Amino acid sequence: IIAGLSGSGGLVNITANRLRMLGDDLKVLAAGYDQVLIDLGAGVEQTVQNLTRSAGQVIVVVTDEPTPLTDAYAFIKVTQTEIPGMGFQVVANIVNSMREGERTYNTLLKACEAFLKISPPLLGIIRRDAKVPEAIRSQTSILTRSPNSEAACDVEKIAKKLLIPGIRS
């Protein structure tokens, strides 16, 4: 996982040549792994779209708040327009229950079906877990710090789906 730095703005003013070089370097890096996940953060900026072009699949992570739902829909809409045929999957994050996660996903799904005529599948749901802020504060993965927590179990289910196509865990 290559995580974006929150609020850094480091990619905003990157030149086209440097962006191309970054994309090439990521492809070299990816060759040594089963999957590479890049956290681009929310947004529809050209830099995010250019990096998205090299992806085989896009995972859209959304919470049940209005702004993230709107941002997720906007990202899918712009990406679908600029990169026809791109596959999307959705993860409902920081939800209080599986039912709330399904409700969050269905809100986004209904908008995508009504206006974009696509139905991105639900990849998984990650429940709100008090262990996550602890892991963040210690700069440790939730899977390392609290491997038996609800959030860690949810992340593992998603990882299995990504690594083993067709799994329904």
What are these regions (language model features)?
Residues 137-169:
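NTP-binding/hydrolysis catalytic cores, primarily Walker-type P-loop NTPases
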Residues 3-4, 38-39, 60-63, 90-93:
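Conserved beta-strand segments of the P-loop GTPase G domain that flank and frequently precede/overlap
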Residues 115-143, 155:
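Beta-strand-loop-alpha "switch" segments that mediate conformational coupling across diverse proteins
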